[in-house]
Amino acid sequence: MIAVDYKGDIYPCVRYMESSLGQDAPPLIIGNVYDGIVQNSLCEQCVKQLKAVNRLTQSSDECINCRIAEGCSWCQAYNYQDSGGDVNHRATYICVMHQARSLANSYYYNRYYLQTN
């Protein structure tokens, strides 16, 4: 979801704005309302980096081979902020909690399914 700030700068998402990132990482500007998107080399570089991001570029082998990873949600901007400005970083400190939640959901769904069918 594209976001625009009071100066007319365009961001790929509100989470990439300076107001969301604070001092943790530089804002990621992809253009402005006056000149458009990708009108200079810096914006073009940002867009190329974002287009290249996927689960494989942001994940370690541990994440890729995780049996829960298929349903694992992640926010590119949060990962960018957590790393201090690297779009190919993935925050993994919540993995244990996500795995526990996913396994609990499976357990209770299966239990419900067995009781109702």
For the regions a protein language model found, what residue spans apply to each?
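Short Fe-S-cluster ligation motifs
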Residues: R90-N117
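Short cysteine/histidine-rich zinc-coordinating motifs and their immediately flanking basic loops
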Residues: C75-N88, S106-N110
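Local cysteine-cluster metal-coordination motifs and their immediate loop/turn environment
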Residues: P12-R15, S59-N79, M97
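Active-site lining segments that contact anionic ligands and/or coordinate catalytic metals
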Residues: M1, D5-K7, A25, Q58-C63, ...
